[in-house]
A protein has these predicted regions:
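Bacterial N-terminal signal peptides that target proteins for export
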Residues: 1-11
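Low-complexity, intrinsically disordered short peptide segments enriched in small/polar/basic residues
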Residues: 4-5, 19-21
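Predominantly soluble domains enriched in secretory-pathway, periplasmic, or organellar proteins
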Residues: 20-375
């Protein structure tokens, strides 16, 4: 019996020693952000909104989020005082005060007890910060089946607190996934095509044809893009791949496969559809440099840099693992790779070499979208 007690005691001491070796994260929720400082906002499992100080390349503060995690898409308010997060399994948007982590806003997309409505990454904040837009996909839940309903654009007032209800609602096209608000008050949203929407009456026009483009000697483009980055240069960019044929016969055996981007400048409304290179690998996200708009950077299994006008791959950097998001600091000389696991990889925009790493407390970032901003 004595030996058994010694074994139990030894096991208990061993467990305590192991637990004491684990990192202890202090409560940083009340740390106010500093004016003029640059930060990176990102989310990760199980319930974290992380604010990174890009000068020290460390976690500045962590806010706790309610509900089920996912997808964790982040959008920063124009005054840089609030972070909005798409959460609870795509069903709600939360608005957090960045200084105190206080939950100040909550919009639930479902509008009835027997309805389930989810937004597939599709929400945005107006340029004056007063309204939040979302296209969500409702279903009616019966006892033995679901009925798919018309997608809808919901408009919320960001001043309506924790029980925000739509102040306007309009039918929307199907398959809308990401969106950004423009300086002229309109809303651009990506679906089968990229649409320009009047948020007062719900009417829309095609700003950039995608599925329905009519480019000579091109096949239909393919688009997979779920990460709405708020960029310093006011670009709303989406990557595509497409076959480019040698002649009107459209022979796939002789076609070149091109990578390109659709772009809307949210300040001017100017649109662009442009190839930037051959398809040699797959990228989940890409951004043009804020320092040199002729340079395109892409990431998934490698980090790459392209000369857009020459349609030439300039550099490629091997990575420790897959990353989904590439984004710049405001100066355009550093790149942050986020998504998938719980580490942020930092790279030189000039050489693409890895120059740092940030380990996040908690679990994986998964398919979150990060944002860089100056307070």
């Amino acid at each position: 019996m004595l030996n058994k007690n010694k074994i139990v005691l030894a096991a208990g001491l061993s467990l305590l020693t192991s637990l004491s070796a684990l990192p202890v994260w202090a409560d940083t929720s009340q740390k106010a952000l500093l004016s003029g400082h640059e930060y990176l906002a990102v989310t990760n499992y199980p319930d974290n909104l992380q604010i990174i100080d890009t000068k020290t390349e460390t976690v500045y503060k962590t806010c706790k989020m309610p509900g089920q995690f996912g997808p964790g898409t982040v959008s920063i308010s124009p005054d840089k005082k609030r972070a909005y997060v798409l959460g609870n399994g795509f069903r709600e948007v939360y608005g957090f005060d960045l200084d105190t982590c206080k939950l100040e806003f909550n919009a639930v997309f479902s509008q009835a007890y027997n309805e389930d409505a989810r937004a597939m990454f599709s929400f945005a904040i107006s340029v004056d910060g007063k309204e939040l837009y979302s296209v969500n996909n409702p279903v009616h839940k019966s006892s033995d089946h679901y009925t798919i309903k018309q997608p809808r654009l919901q408009v919320f007032s960001t001043a309506d607190g924790l029980k925000a209800k739509p102040i306007r609602s309009f039918p929307a096209p199907r398959q809308v996934y990401i969106m950004q608000a423009a300086d002229d008050g309109s809303l651009y949203m990506a679906g089968p095509d990229i649409y320009k929407v009047n948020v007062q009456d719900g009417s829309y026009t095609v700003a950039i044809p995608s599925r329905n483009w009519k480019r000579e000697n091109y096949g239909q483009p393919d688009v997979l893009y779920f990460w709405p980055h708020q960029q310093v240069n006011r670009d709303f960019s989406i990557l595509y791949t497409a076959p480019k044929f040698t002649d009107a016969s459209q022979d796939m055996d002789t076609a070149e496969f091109k990578y390109g981007f659709f772009n809307v400048n949210l300040a001017t409304g100017e649109t662009q559809t442009k190839d930037f290179g051959d398809v040699v690998e797959i990228y989940f996200t890409g951004q043009r440099s804020p320092a040199d708009p002729n340079l395109m950077y892409g990431v998934l299994n490698r980090l790459t840099k392209y000369d857009i006008e020459k349609e030439e791959l300039l550099q490629a950097q091997e990575l420790d693992h897959t990353y989904y998001n590439v984004l710049f600091n405001t100066e355009g000389d550093k790149l942050y790779l986020v998504g998938t696991l719980s580490d942020i990889s930092i790279h030189s925009a000039q050489s693409l070499e890895k120059i740092g790493s940030i380990k996040l407390p908690g679990g994986d970032m998964a398919i979150t979208t990060a944002q860089v901003f100056i307070r």
